[in-house]
Design a protein with these regions (language model features):
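Canonical helix-turn-helix DNA-binding module
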Residues: 60-104
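Terminal interaction helix/tail motif
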Residues: 121-168
Length: 203
């Protein structure tokens, strides 16, 4: 017997897991809509909106095609094509590595920074909705979403993310979260989706 589709409303009625998946799919649709609406205003693509936003906030060591590809779960070729387009428009420039001429980092030009500060606001409607939930619900949702992301990492659906649960400094002590870098327990709301001190586990 074939497995029922997650997106069959009749199946969803008696399967909470399918309703959760369907709800997450609706949220992903909302992000696609918000990205497209922002991108079309400036004649760029949704991934270019995300790249500009990324380059505005991340440190130089992470401003490479390799890191961008891992962050957005795309091939390096796809990311390179997107960068070539916004570089041609004068929004991004490449900086050669002083120690390795084959390597380079990516930087926003003055025009690129100005555009990035505009387009990075694409998710504001989602932020407003989340803020209405209150701190306790936000923390609970954050914790469960991080567990979901971690499981998808394990299934190789997406690349490992720079979050607490994947970090060598993270430890689960019973039901509590502990960071061995700062030697402190973390509340669910303190967990990070992307931590600047992230280190991959050894081995």
């Amino acid at each position: 017997m074939a497995k029922e589709s997650t997106f069959n409303p009749e199946h969803q009625a008696t399967h909470t897991s399918s309703k959760v998946v369907a709800a997450l799919e609706r949220i992903s649709e909302a992000f696609r809509v918000m990205l497209w609406q922002e991108a079309k205003q400036y004649g760029i693509s949704p991934i270019q909106v995300q790249i500009l936003t990324y380059l505005l906030h991340y440190p130089e060591k992470l401003k490479t095609v390799t890191h961008l590809a891992a962050h957005f779960n795309m091939t390096k070729a796809t990311v390179s094509d997107a960068i070539k387009s916004i570089a041609a428009k004068g929004f991004v420039k490449r900086k050669e590595d002083s120690e390795d001429s084959r390597s380079h980092s990516l930087h926003l030009t003055r025009e690129g920074k100005a555009l990035a500060r505009k387009v990075e606001r694409f998710a504001e409607p989602m932020e407003i909705s989340v803020q209405k939930m209150g701190p306790e619900k936000q923390s609970g949702i954050l914790e469960q979403l991080l567990y979901l992301i971690q499981d998808l990492n394990g299934q190789l659906v997406i690349t490992p993310q720079r979050m607490c649960l994947n970090c060598r400094f993270y430890e689960k002590k019973g039901k509590l979260h502990y960071c061995n870098l700062v030697n402190a327990f973390l509340k669910a709301g303190d967990l990070r989706v992307d931590c600047p001190e992230f280190r991959m586990p050894a081995g």
